[in-house]
Every structure is written in structure tokens, then in C-alpha cells.
Amino acid sequence: PLEFSPQDNLRKAPSDALYPLFMKLEFTKLIDKYGLKPPADIPAAEEPVDLTVTAEAVTTVEKAKEYLSLFRKAEHVTLLALPDLSGVIVDFVAGESTAVSAEFYFSRYEGDWNALLRALFSDDIKKVSHNVKDLQRTLLENGLPIEGFIFDTALAGYLLDATAGKYDIASLFAAYFHQTLAEPKHLDPDAFSMLGDTAEAETAFHVYTSAVDALYETFAPELEKRELHELYYEVELPLCAVLARMEHAGMRVDANALAAFGSEMEVQLKTLEQHIYEEAGGPFNINSPKQLGDVLFGKLELPAKKKTKSGYSTNAEVLEELIPYHPIISKILEYRKYKKLSSTYVEGLKDTIGPDSRIRSVFRQTDTRTGRISSAEPNMQNI
């Protein structure tokens, strides 16, 4: 007799071979099921990345002009901004190799803050940042230019691994450099107050900006190596500005027409509701799967197809098979159609209409594994 079981001969799946194959075939669920990881095309840094820089607070117009002149001469600068644009950290290389960080804060700056931002975000200064589209939308909301962005580390991280799921600075830095950064709550309008210590928080802000620069230096050549640079520079990166402008402009909605459409739906729902009650022999909660199941398979004794732990299944597939058995079924399906229209397209949209009669959805480039753009707050793809 054989002295081993089938389990003794099981071998671990070759992740390096299966991952690219499953990605090509779009077997994303199998990638998750078997815990497959992408091949280590980008080796982790052997030495910890030094994120310390020489920092200077810029408070005067004269000093700002000096730095802006240096920024224009630099090959690129790396910057992060607070969500309300009240603070900006800019890293750049001065001379041959000296890393310098300049910090700008509205509360400390003696000059025209908007003039400074207009200069900083013009095309004269080539900028690397993280989540560029979000920053560009904020700039547009403040009447500022959105030019000169040459790299977005979040977008590059997504192209290099669309299955990672997390593309914040800390997650990307941990994945590629095996170093842990402080919680990414430093980008707060209120002078980083949640960290408790302003000096500590400002240090974290500098560290994150330096981390973005380190990611840029790693990601840019990797995009070339994987022949993703054309897709990145000709499609994905320019798309950031397009989406930012779309979010800023919004989509005009006629609230009165939407309300009228909603009223039509309510009339249809009320009419169908009464017909369903008549067929069922009395009122019940049509939206309750349990009560609906009790009516259909208990009271009306229709043939039950599926039963779950909580009761009979009343999903669309089950109901469609029951259409020949009773006229109530087609009315329930029609009721659900109008209910969906009312809840998704009337109730779901009316609360998102702004004072200017526009809906401003958020378009995301890094949410899906297939590369398509997703929409949220509200999800316009449902329409």
C-alpha cells in the first residue's frame, strides 16, 4: 500500500507564473482566492530611504520670489498641499545634489497668497505630486491654474499594480521600500492639529513630500521598463486635468423635471401597489422578501424554487420563472422596476444637487482592476 496521502503531494501554486496569466485572463477572483502576488519586478530598497531634507519656512515675498526662481530652474519639484490650500510643502534639488524643502503657510506668509499660488501652479514650474486630480479640482475651485504637473505617484502606483487596492502614500511607500510612515492624517487644514504637536505634524508633512519624491524616482523608470510610459503620459496623466474640470463644472440637472419624474413614479407605484394587494388578498410589505415569500409560497401556494435561511428566495430570477403561474408576479416585477427608478434616479440624485443646480460626482482612476473610470458621490454610471 502507498504510505502517503494526496495532501502529501500537493504543491504550492507558482505565484510568479500564475499571477501574470490570471491578470491577462482577468481571473481577479482567483488571484484573491489563492493569495497570488505580482512578481517582484521592483526590488525593495536595500537601505532605508532617507527622507530628511533641509527645510526653510517662506514668510516674505522676497524669499518666495527667490524660491520660485529656483523652482523654475529645477528639473522638477515635488509638492503636497493641504486640502484647503492653506499650506504647501515643496521639495526640490538645489545645485547638484542638495535636497531642500520650502514650506509655505497662509497664516505666516506676508504677501499675496493667491499670487504665490498662481505662480507655483503655473506651467513654468514642473511638479510631481500625489492624487493630482484632487489637487487640480481644488485649484480650479479657487480660480487657480492647474498646469505643470508631470507626474502623479498614485496613478503610477495603480498602473504598476492595479490589484493593490491602496494607493495612498504610506501604503505605496511600505510596499516598495518596506518602511512605515506616520498615519496619513497630516494633510489637515487645521495645522495638523489631530497629531497633537504642530512641530511633529509639520515634520510628517515634510516626510510625506520626500516619500512622494522617492516613489517618483522609482516609478518613472519602472513605467518605461514595463512599456507603460505611453499609456501613462499620453492618456492617464492628461486625463487627470480633464476629470478635474468635469468635477468642477458638474452636470446641470433640472430639479423641477426630476421632481415631476418622481411624482410620476409615485403614481405608478401606488397603482401597482393596489393591484398587488388585490391579487394577494390583502396588504403586506412588498419590499420585504420574507413577507413577499410568505404571500407567494404560503398564501398563494406558488411552487417554491429556492429557500434561504431567512425564508423563500424572491429574487428576479425566481420571480421570472413564476410569471406563468399567477398574474401577481408580473405586477411585482413592474413594481420593483419603478421602485428602482424612484430610489436610484430620483431620491438618489435630488440630495446631491448643489445650489447652482449641478451635480458634482467624483471620478476615480484608481478604483477598478480593469482600468475603467469609476464614479461616486453619486455614482453616475447607474444612469
Language-model features, listed with the residues they occupy:
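Conserved "right-hand" nucleotidyltransferase catalytic core of DNA-directed polymerases
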Residues: 1-108, 130, 172, 194-383
